[in-house]
Protein backbone atom coordinates (compact mmCIF):
# COMPACT_ATOMS: atom_id res chain seq x y z
CA UNK A 1 0.00 0.00 0.00
CA UNK A 2 1.04 3.59 -0.52
CA UNK A 3 0.26 6.97 0.95
CA UNK A 4 -1.46 9.40 -1.38
CA UNK A 5 -0.92 13.17 -1.45
CA UNK A 6 -3.88 15.09 -0.02
CA UNK A 7 -4.72 18.30 -1.88
CA UNK A 8 -4.80 21.38 0.34
CA UNK A 9 -7.41 24.15 -0.03
CA UNK A 10 -7.52 26.47 -1.98
CA UNK A 11 -6.12 24.05 -4.60
CA UNK A 12 -8.42 24.44 -7.62
CA UNK A 13 -8.44 20.67 -8.24
CA UNK A 14 -10.66 20.31 -5.15
CA UNK A 15 -13.40 22.01 -7.19
CA UNK A 16 -13.43 19.24 -9.80
CA UNK A 17 -16.68 17.27 -9.95
CA UNK A 18 -15.90 13.54 -9.78
CA UNK A 19 -16.94 11.10 -12.50
CA UNK A 20 -18.82 7.85 -11.81
CA UNK A 21 -16.84 4.63 -11.40
CA UNK A 22 -17.67 1.96 -13.98
CA UNK A 23 -14.71 -0.44 -13.73
CA UNK A 24 -14.31 -2.47 -10.53
CA UNK A 25 -10.90 -4.06 -11.09
CA UNK A 26 -7.76 -4.80 -9.07
CA UNK A 27 -6.47 -1.28 -9.69
CA UNK A 28 -9.59 0.12 -7.99
CA UNK A 29 -9.13 -2.24 -5.03
CA UNK A 30 -5.53 -1.09 -4.57
CA UNK A 31 -6.58 2.55 -4.83
CA UNK A 32 -9.27 2.06 -2.15
CA UNK A 33 -6.70 0.38 0.13
CA UNK A 34 -4.36 3.34 -0.43
CA UNK A 35 -7.19 5.76 0.39
CA UNK A 36 -7.77 4.00 3.72
CA UNK A 37 -4.04 3.97 4.49
CA UNK A 38 -3.82 7.70 3.72
CA UNK A 39 -6.94 8.47 5.77
CA UNK A 40 -5.57 6.63 8.83
CA UNK A 41 -2.11 8.19 8.42
CA UNK A 42 -3.67 11.67 8.32
CA UNK A 43 -5.94 10.77 11.27
CA UNK A 44 -9.14 11.41 9.33
CA UNK A 45 -12.50 9.66 9.54
CA UNK A 46 -13.39 10.08 5.86
CA UNK A 47 -11.68 10.68 2.54
CA UNK A 48 -13.01 11.38 -0.95
CA UNK A 49 -10.99 10.42 -4.02
CA UNK A 50 -11.15 14.06 -5.17
CA UNK A 51 -8.99 14.99 -2.17
CA UNK A 52 -6.15 12.85 -3.54
CA UNK A 53 -6.55 14.20 -7.08
CA UNK A 54 -8.45 11.20 -8.45
CA UNK A 55 -11.73 12.53 -9.74
CA UNK A 56 -13.84 9.40 -9.35
CA UNK A 57 -16.90 9.02 -7.09
CA UNK A 58 -15.21 7.03 -4.29
CA UNK A 59 -15.42 7.61 -0.54
CA UNK A 60 -13.75 5.79 2.35
CA UNK A 61 -15.04 6.19 5.91
CA UNK A 62 -14.14 4.79 9.32
CA UNK A 63 -15.81 6.85 12.05
CA UNK A 64 -14.25 4.84 14.87
CA UNK A 65 -10.79 4.52 13.34
CA UNK A 66 -10.58 0.87 14.37
CA UNK A 67 -10.32 -0.57 10.84
CA UNK A 68 -13.14 -2.95 11.81
CA UNK A 69 -16.04 -0.86 10.44
CA UNK A 70 -14.64 0.46 7.19
CA UNK A 71 -17.21 1.84 4.76
CA UNK A 72 -16.62 2.21 1.03
CA UNK A 73 -19.17 4.21 -0.95
CA UNK A 74 -18.77 4.17 -4.72
CA UNK A 75 -21.07 6.34 -6.83
CA UNK A 76 -22.99 7.40 -3.68
CA UNK A 77 -26.28 9.22 -3.96
CA UNK A 78 -28.35 10.63 -1.11
CA UNK A 79 -31.94 9.53 -1.71
CA UNK A 80 -33.53 10.96 1.44
CA UNK A 81 -32.46 13.23 4.28
CA UNK A 82 -34.19 14.34 7.45
CA UNK A 83 -33.70 16.61 10.45
CA UNK A 84 -31.24 19.37 11.12
CA UNK A 85 -27.86 19.14 12.81
CA UNK A 86 -24.32 20.36 12.41
CA UNK A 87 -20.94 20.34 14.06
CA UNK A 88 -17.62 22.12 13.82
CA UNK A 89 -16.24 20.18 10.88
CA UNK A 90 -12.61 19.61 10.06
CA UNK A 91 -11.09 18.37 6.83
CA UNK A 92 -7.83 16.78 5.71
CA UNK A 93 -7.77 19.33 2.87
CA UNK A 94 -8.04 22.21 5.37
CA UNK A 95 -5.56 21.05 8.03
CA UNK A 96 -5.99 22.55 11.48
CA UNK A 97 -9.10 24.53 10.52
CA UNK A 98 -12.70 23.98 11.59
CA UNK A 99 -16.05 25.53 10.80
CA UNK A 100 -19.70 24.97 11.64
CA UNK A 101 -21.69 23.51 8.75
CA UNK A 102 -25.44 22.83 8.90
CA UNK A 103 -26.19 19.26 7.83
CA UNK A 104 -29.05 16.77 7.79
CA UNK A 105 -29.30 14.50 10.86
CA UNK A 106 -30.24 11.36 8.91
CA UNK A 107 -29.50 10.29 5.34
CA UNK A 108 -30.44 7.31 3.19
CA UNK A 109 -27.71 6.59 0.66
CA UNK A 110 -27.62 4.37 -2.40
CA UNK A 111 -24.10 3.32 -3.41
CA UNK A 112 -21.97 0.50 -4.71
CA UNK A 113 -19.45 -1.49 -2.70
CA UNK A 114 -15.90 -2.41 -3.72
CA UNK A 115 -17.21 -5.18 -5.97
CA UNK A 116 -19.73 -2.94 -7.72
CA UNK A 117 -22.76 -4.36 -5.92
CA UNK A 118 -25.58 -1.91 -5.15
CA UNK A 119 -26.57 -1.38 -1.52
CA UNK A 120 -28.49 1.04 0.67
CA UNK A 121 -27.20 2.64 3.86
CA UNK A 122 -29.22 4.46 6.50
CA UNK A 123 -26.96 6.75 8.51
CA UNK A 124 -27.43 9.26 11.30
CA UNK A 125 -25.32 11.41 13.57
CA UNK A 126 -21.60 11.65 12.82
CA UNK A 127 -21.76 9.05 10.04
CA UNK A 128 -24.49 11.02 8.24
CA UNK A 129 -22.46 14.23 8.61
CA UNK A 130 -19.32 12.51 7.30
CA UNK A 131 -21.16 11.09 4.28
CA UNK A 132 -22.56 14.53 3.39
CA UNK A 133 -19.11 16.11 3.83
CA UNK A 134 -17.43 13.55 1.56
CA UNK A 135 -20.17 13.68 -1.09
CA UNK A 136 -19.66 17.46 -1.12
CA UNK A 137 -16.01 16.77 -2.07
CA UNK A 138 -17.15 14.56 -4.95
CA UNK A 139 -19.25 17.50 -6.14
CA UNK A 140 -16.33 19.94 -5.95
CA UNK A 141 -17.39 21.51 -2.65
CA UNK A 142 -15.27 21.88 0.50
CA UNK A 143 -16.78 22.72 3.88
CA UNK A 144 -15.35 26.24 3.64
CA UNK A 145 -17.77 26.86 0.76
CA UNK A 146 -20.60 26.65 3.32
CA UNK A 147 -19.06 29.48 5.39
CA UNK A 148 -19.33 33.24 5.02
CA UNK A 149 -17.00 34.90 2.48
CA UNK A 150 -15.04 36.53 5.33
CA UNK A 151 -14.45 33.23 7.15
CA UNK A 152 -13.53 31.55 3.87
CA UNK A 153 -10.99 34.27 3.07
CA UNK A 154 -9.43 33.96 6.54
CA UNK A 155 -9.10 30.20 6.05
CA UNK A 156 -7.39 30.69 2.69
CA UNK A 157 -4.95 33.15 4.22
CA UNK A 158 -4.11 30.81 7.12
CA UNK A 159 -3.55 27.86 4.80
CA UNK A 160 -1.44 29.83 2.34
CA UNK A 161 0.70 31.07 5.24
CA UNK A 162 1.06 27.49 6.50
CA UNK A 163 2.04 26.25 3.03
CA UNK A 164 4.73 28.94 2.78
CA UNK A 165 6.12 27.94 6.18
CA UNK A 166 6.22 24.27 5.16
CA UNK A 167 7.94 25.10 1.86
CA UNK A 168 10.47 27.27 3.71
CA UNK A 169 11.36 24.44 6.10
CA UNK A 170 12.04 21.92 3.32
Swiss-Prot record:
The keyword Lipoprotein does not apply. The active site is at residue 134. Signal peptide: none annotated. Binds 1 Fe(2+) ion. Fe cation binds at residues 91, 133, 137. CDD domains: Pep_deformylase (cd00487). It catalyses: N-terminal N-formyl-L-methionyl-[peptide] + H2O = N-terminal L-methionyl-[peptide] + formate. Its EC number is 3.5.1.88. GO terms for biological process: co-translational protein modification; translation. Removes the formyl group from the N-terminal Met of newly synthesized proteins. Requires at least a dipeptide for an efficient rate of reaction. N-terminal L-methionine is a prerequisite for activity but the enzyme has broad specificity at other positions. This is Peptide deformylase. The lineage of its organism: Bacteria, Pseudomonadati, Pseudomonadota, Gammaproteobacteria, Pasteurellales.
Amino acid sequence: MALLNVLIYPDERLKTVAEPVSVFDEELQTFIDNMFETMYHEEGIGLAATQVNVHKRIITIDIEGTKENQIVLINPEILESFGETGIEEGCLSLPGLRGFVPRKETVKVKAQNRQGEDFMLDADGLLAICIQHEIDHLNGIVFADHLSPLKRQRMKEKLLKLQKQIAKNR
